[in-house]
Amino acid sequence: MKKIIALLLALVMAFGLVACGGGEAASSEGGEIAIFWYTFGDTYLSSVRAAMNEALNASGAKYHNYDANGSQTTQTEQIQTAITAGAGVLVVNIVDASSDDATQAIIDMAKNANLPLVFFNRSVSEELVSAYDKAAYVGTDYTMAGHMEGKMIGEHLVANYDAIDLNGDGVISYVMFKGQEGNMEADARTQYGVEDADAVLAAAGKPALEFYDASNTSKYLVDQNGAWSAAEGQNYMQTILTQYSEANGNMVELVIANNDDMALGAIAALQAAGYNKNDGGVTIPVFGVDATAVAQEAIAAKSMTGTIKQDAVGMANAVVLIAQNLMAGKDKFENVQGDLEGTWRVNIPYSAYSG
């Protein structure tokens, strides 16, 4: 009986050491790669996840994907669960990219468990990430997508101005769909997508773009859920088309979206109204960002005009390699492909895509 009691006590103590997770007890060596997604519902991130799974499977690594379904609270709880279960590295696509508090909380959790931490895709603070030597960020030059989208839009408008100016007033009216408030990528794409298009138009002697609704001082429509979703793009466009039309002489002549999902949602609404069907009728130019497979198909079908490619495979490979480097105690950016920024970040380049 004494031997049985001693054995039970030993098991309880062993479990306690694992459950506490903290400090050196939570060594990253040999643990699984815990990957936290802000949502499984994002089309671009689904392509990143598929590429990441492929790379991890090829390397024989143990990993687990977690879906926060848009909830920062859920994601934070998932991270703690993974730490307690013995994760070897935390890979985080943060839900609340606008919150330094959320970022700091995740960093503190990683620090307390002595675990490497890789943020990716959704922007986080340089100051916070740089303060933890086992942390890194994989993203993009968030201003680049907006600049490239704006240039692409401006060049397309200049080349096709009269056909796009449906009411012949000499000005192109547009709508801008913004993915999320407080998100640096969304802010930059919203700003530069218009500013750079205007610069190209000005160089060609054309007037600046004009937001379709003069009463909207922000000059964009934002996904109130911060989900960058096709549903929001479609709902907004459907509402617009009830008041703005060719018959009324005020049709929206250009659609700019922060991502492909919102662009594709707008296209669905346009097609329901008889536009963008490649049937000899009117096509409203629609631009997005990501170059998802569905967007590429839409461009091939001529229902979408162009997009900016965000390299899903490149991002996935960089995240996996950095995570594995950190777990192995190597230089975090060893053999990583991309544009390094200081000692905290690597950017995956964009490219224009029009078919």
Regions found by a protein language model. Give the residues of each.
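Extracytoplasmic "Venus flytrap"
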Residues: 31-51, 55-56, 63-81, 85-87, ...
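Short, solvent-exposed amphipathic alpha-helices that sit
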Residues: 44-59, 145-149, 184-212, 216, ...
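Short, low-complexity disordered leader/linker segments with a strong preference
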Residues: 1-32, 57-58, 62, 105-115
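Hydrophobic alpha-helical segments within soluble ligand-binding/sensing domains
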Residues: 33, 75, 136-169, 188, ...
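Hinge/cleft segment of the Venus flytrap/periplasmic-binding protein
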Residues: 168-181, 185, 196-198, 311-355
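Flexible loop/hinge segments that line or gate small-molecule binding clefts
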Residues: 106-144, 148, 160-171, 175-177, ...
